[in-house]
From Swiss-Prot:
This is Deoxycytidylate 5-hydroxymethyltransferase. SUPFAM superfamilies: Thymidylate synthase/dCMP hydroxymethylase. The keyword Transferase applies. Keywords: Transferase. Belongs to the thymidylate synthase family. The active site is at 148. GO terms for molecular function: deoxycytidylate 5-hydroxymethyltransferase activity. The gene is 42. InterPro entries: Deoxycytidylate_hydroxyMease (IPR014619), Thymidate_synth/dCMP_Mease_dom (IPR023451), Thymidate_synth/dCMP_Mease_sf (IPR036926). The keyword Transferase applies.
Length: 246
């Protein structure tokens, strides 16, 4: 059975209450946030607040597939956030394709695929993204990139493959929607690859359970939370918003 975790809609409610109560946490840069510590929910929607950017999601996916650790290799214009966190050489840690497919990180995808192929009931089907040396690697050569995803565990139950995502930190607006798209892609690929290895398996994608140490909204996106609280709508263009958090 799947734990009776919260849903995305319930996460919205908790964040909305935090904003209404002005329960702010100030981050290291002095920016106000609202935050849920130890968030755990079923990712039953592809975004929490805002709207999907399918064009960027596809570009990021292509970059992940390349396994490049250099932000210049992101197709199209390199997003400012990646430029800001990259080292003086334009290098980062958080190419998630590198994290699961590279031999330099011990081929996590292949290890997980082999484990679940041999032992469908296994609890060892894990892709480990981060590493102990991240304590030092995150600021190498002027970088500021401490990988946000720790591990993703895959459990096969009742012919469904469930993903349990474990993160240290996740931005609700830009972070979650892009990370969800990536995790959905990997889950679907894992299902396909396991089924291709044995036609009798007929596995399907199950739930994605999202566990985060700090799930947060930055002040620049408070208007989205407020708009949802007042209207039930998850997105509005900022120029059209006329509330307190303009």
């Amino acid at each position: 059975m799947i734990s009776d975790s919260m849903t995305v809609e319930e996460i919205r409610l908790h964040l909305g209450l935090a904003l209404k109560e002005k329960d702010f946490v100030v981050d290291k840069t002095g920016v106000k946030t609202i935050e849920i510590i130890g968030a755990s929910f079923v990712a039953d929607e592809p975004f929490i607040f805002g709207a999907l950017n399918d064009e960027y999601i596809q570009r990021e996916l292509e970059w992940y597939k390349s396994k490049s650790l250099f932000v210049k290799d992101i197709p199209g214009e390199t997003p400012k956030i990646w430029q800001q966190v990259a080292s003086s050489k334009g290098e980062i840690n958080s190419n998630y394709g590198w994290a699961i497919w590279s031999e330099d990180n011990y081929a996590q995808y292949d290890m997980c695929l082999a484990e679940l192929g041999q032992n469908p009931d296994s609890r060892r089907g894990i892709m480990i993204y981060t590493r102990p040396s991240m304590q030092f690697d995150y600021n190498k050569d002027g970088m500021s990139d401490f990988m946000c995803t720790n591990t993703v565990q895959y459990l096969i139950r009742d012919k469904k493959i469930n993903a349990v995502v474990n993160m240290r930190s996740n931005d609700v607006v830009f972070g979650f929607r892009n990370d969800y798209a990536w995790q959905k892609y990997v889950l679907d690929k894992l299902v396909s690859d396991l089924n291709a290895g044995d036609s009798t398996r007929q596995y399907k994608a199950g739930s994605i359970i999202w566990n985060v140490g700090s799930l947060h909204v930055y002040s620049r996106h408070f208007y989205l939370v407020d708009h949802w609280w007042n209207t039930g709508e998850t997105h509005i263009v900022k120029k059209d918003y006329n509330g307190e958090w303009k």
